[in-house]
Amino acid sequence: MAEISKMAGVSLATVSRTIHSPHLVRKGTLERVNQVMERLNYVYHATAGDLSRKRSSIIGVIIPTAKSLVFSSTLQAIQEAAQQNNFSLVAGSSKYDIETELSLLQQFKERRLAGIILTGFVVGQKDLIKELVKGGMPCVVIWDKLDDSDLSYVGFDNFKATYRITEYLISLRHRHIGLIVGPYTKVERVKRRLEGFKAALTAHGLKFDPELVIEKEPTLIDGKEAMSRLLSLPVRPTAVLAASDTLAVGALAAARDMNVRVPEDISIAGFDDIEVAAYCNPPLTTVRVPAYEIGQIAFKILLGMINGNSDQLQQYCLDTSVIIRGSCRELDNDVISKS
């Protein structure tokens, strides 16, 4: 923790609060400390003495990135529920990398943790999770709906959620829609978002154009770079769906820098409904994801497994909703004729 404190320019107490009570830390400080922890691939080891006891009181949690506020919301819910039940957390970030995620899972297995909460799947990693479960490790997968799965999960239908927001853009008469999406070649749930986007276009007789799809890490700078590319195309899209609000905020910045008005010249929609989405200029149309509720339910399921109260498969697919704000508008007839 001392190295994190030094690199982030904050006190050890602030680092501790970031880990234990992130809701008490200012947003800018929280993001700075989380970025340093992610850069160092830091894993917090709580109450290490529990490892020598018969039953551990530590739960492992793997999230894709500490930079995203939406994953922080899920982590906060798990942390609060864990504290109420006298459990502590080991939290790690996979950085959307399969080797990093497998390494974290192996560490958790070797430390004989009480259970694991895992954010979806990096492509190619599902078999290891099944091995852990068969070996007696309680495990709950979050942030995705797993079809034909023998694993407990709490998530939502990424395919359907993306289909709906794409269909909303189509209802505004957009026919030339760009997509800025996370690492779909690495992450199963992100791949399903791409598939939902494609399916909505096909269902409405629209052609899928790979040139309008840009794969990026879900960061502000990547969202800005991707949007700049889309706006520089000979025929640019009339609407852009960013498959995370972080990417969408970056896209808004790019449009502003290039003097492209939102929504007058181009519509932009996001995904997640993080807190800042409502305060963007213009406020961001997006998909509301029950991030906090996912964490609460996941811990409840895991606690039942740990206590031996439930050996049945539990699978929750929660609802999402399209939140309509000011960043999208219906196309005028003259624009449609040109697109």
Model-derived regions: residue spans:
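Central regulatory/effector-binding core of bacterial HTH transcription factors
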Residues: E80-Q125
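Flexible loop/hinge segments that line or gate small-molecule binding clefts
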Residues: Y96, T119-R164, Y184-T185, L206, ...
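Short beta-strand segments enriched in small/hydrophobic residues
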Residues: L12-R17, L51-K67, Y168, H176-P183
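N-terminal helix-turn-helix DNA-binding module of bacterial transcription factors
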Residues: M1-S57, R329, K338
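N-terminal helix-turn-helix/winged-helix DNA-binding helices
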Residues: E38-Q76, Q84-F87, K95-D97, Q107-E110
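Flexible loop/turn connectors
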Residues: A226-S339
